[in-house]
Amino acid sequence: MEKDKKYILRYALLDYIATLIAWQLFNIYRFYEVRSTVYFNTLGDFLINTKAILMGIGMPLFWLIVYFYSGYYAKPRQKNHTSDLLSTLFSTLTGSLIIFFAVIINDYPEQYTLYYRVFAGLFLIHFFCTWFVRFLQTSRLLNLHAEGKVGINVLIIGSGKVAGKLSRQMQQTKNSSAYLLKGFIRVNSEEKAVAEQDILGDTEQLKEIIKEQRIEALILATDRQDSDYTEGLLKQLYVYHLDILSVIHKQDLLFSNITLYSLPGVPLKYLSPTQLKPWEQNLKRSTDILVSVLGLLVLSPLFVFLALRIRLESAGPILYRQERLGKEMKPFTILKFRTMFAHSEPEGPLLSSLNDERITPFGRFLRKYRLDELPQLWNVLKGEMSLVGPRPERRFYVERIVDQAPQYYLVYRVKPGITSLGMVKYGYADSVEKMIERLEYDLIY
């Protein structure tokens, strides 16, 4: 989000400055600690030699990459000192090990024990420099949270006793919470236990309220706790593509697979989680880029052959372009090798079937081995898709699916993929019913 970009840049800039200073301090320490093996007469000569200057430029960039892959820059407005400490400890240890074996081990100290002291110096200097600037920035951020100037705007769905208790807990911990409570949403005939002026409306007005208040998360806190009632509410909330959390009820403690999120002193459960952690998402994206680039290069001769074969078999374009819905339901143009005769949908969208007469003979071969999907490597490289994820669908079919299965909105919290477990299980779906059956597997992502 736009609000996050500002704080991501701020944290990244401070990290850059901290690592730049830390590397120079480490070089000073390194010069005196391993002086007998450093071929410079003075510290000044050591710090301004060409290699040291290049390393001074490259090291901060290296550290930013390490911090990025650690997931530190995800959700920058939800930082706290504990998470900062743990994340900084883990990432600086990882980065220090890489630098030690790539750079420091070439120093060849006279005493083997110097290796340990140099590594300890590298780790401790980088850790304290980085953690110090992060501590200052996060302290400032927490002060802004307490003043209500920065945070995640949330609504509580409910206005009864449970909602009232939750709001009091949030008020008591507002100094350390990233969530800014904007108000309550009345649900049916629930007995009111909060101030009337804090109730912004009911579920029928929720769309307008979310837009006006710039809401980023919803917390379900109704007095009724039965699963059918909760499921009915969730079906109304999924459409907004926001984080959805809920207070924890006694029956939730019977299940070990719920995803927890804790406000300070207020445990909540996530009802719309993504399965991958931030660092896993970063690693997945890097894998997508690497594999898609290699795939496009290595398979280019095959692409040429398939393109010629398609062109010779029937009139029409080689590539089939169609609008699909991607992450957060943003439309994009998907690419495929054409497997049908041109103009095969004169009367509107129509799903294909196993013996569909619109499919060309060579198109059947392409579909059998999924070769028609290969051009989507370009979609993956552009960031519109991933190698693995729920299959993207046309808006026409999405609207019909969500009418019967509103939880389908959850798949749009992640990027669609070239392949998925549902695709392996069901193949090409030839009806909305099969698409809904495939949803069971798509929700895994």
Regions found by a protein language model. Give the residues of each.
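Hydrophobic alpha-helical elements at and bordering transmembrane segments
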Residues: 85-89, 120, 283-290, 439
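Signature of alpha-helical transmembrane segments in polytopic membrane proteins
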Residues: 1-149
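A short, structured surface patch at a secondary-structure boundary
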Residues: 352-415
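N-terminal hydrophobic signal-anchor/signal peptide
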Residues: 1-18, 22, 30, 78-80, ...
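C-terminal terminal-structure detector
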Residues: 382, 396, 405-445
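Membrane-cytosol interface motif
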Residues: 88-92, 147-165, 317-340
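A hydrophobic, helix-centered structural microdomain
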Residues: 280-344, 379
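Loop-to-transmembrane-helix entry motif
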Residues: 50-51, 88-92, 96, 286-297, ...
